[in-house]
């Protein structure tokens, strides 16, 4: 576990090396953060999750011998991320099935908002990518609009929403599996910092 405060995290000290650092925002039940980094031992991964129970589930799935390039942070990600992550220090980000907050009165709680995108643009290296997936069609439309109206990002794909994952070694998360089982196929999006 990585403790965050008001000071900038020393990522090299946290991981013990200077390898590129990727973040997962909302590690959920831990499928992605415990599996995908195994395919990329040359990268470091910092998983953020706000719920203590989910952090404990993630920790159960992580093995120090296998997941030596993974660290977890129990903290909500919002625009304040730029207060504890150094500018242009993150190689990329993964956001898997964030809470869609479907009721209109709750839309202000949605993760993907301009203030977060502005902060992410500040901490990402040039040309870094953000991979996003959601099974909620209206939220997918919202995400696309937020990214495409941001001055910091463009879609990698001409057709912004894809039906197939845009990652080698795609990890199917519990949320993706459950929603697909109920007839809600995921949309995959990939954006690049400009």
Q: Could you describe each region identified by the protein language model?
A:
Residues 126-134:
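Conserved beta-strand signature within the Rossmann-like core of class I S-adenosyl-L-methionine
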Residues 145, 150-194:
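Class I S-adenosyl-L-methionine
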Residues 56-61, 142:
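Short alpha-helix adjacent to the SAM-binding motif of class I
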Residues 26-28:
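Class I SAM-dependent methyltransferase "Motif I" SAM/SAH-binding loop
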Residues 1-21, 31-38, 59-87:
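S-adenosyl-L-methionine
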């Amino acid at each position: 576990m990585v403790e965050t405060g008001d000071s900038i995290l020393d990522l090299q000290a946290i991981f013990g090396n200077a390898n590129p650092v990727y973040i997962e925002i909302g590690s959920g039940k831990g499928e992605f953060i415990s599996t995908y980094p195994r395919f990329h031992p040359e990268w470091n991964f910092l998983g953020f999750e706000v719920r203590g129970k989910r952090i404990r589930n993630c920790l159960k799935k992580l093995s120090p011998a296998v997941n030596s390039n993974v660290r977890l942070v129990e903290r909500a990600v919002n625009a304040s991320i730029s207060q504890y992550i150094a500018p242009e220090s993150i190689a990329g980000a993964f956001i898997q099935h964030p809470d869609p907050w479907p009721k209109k009165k709750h839309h202000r709680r949605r993760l993907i908002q301009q203030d977060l995108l502005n902060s992410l643009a500040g901490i990402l290296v040039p040309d870094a990518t953000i991979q996003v997936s959601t099974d909620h069609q209206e939220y997918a439309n919202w995400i696309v609009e937020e990214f495409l109206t941001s001055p910091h990002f463009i879609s990698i794909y001409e057709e912004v929403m894809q039906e197939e994952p845009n990652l080698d070694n795609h990890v199917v998360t519990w949320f993706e599996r459950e929603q697909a089982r109920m007839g809600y196929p995921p949309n995959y999006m990939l954006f690049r910092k400009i």
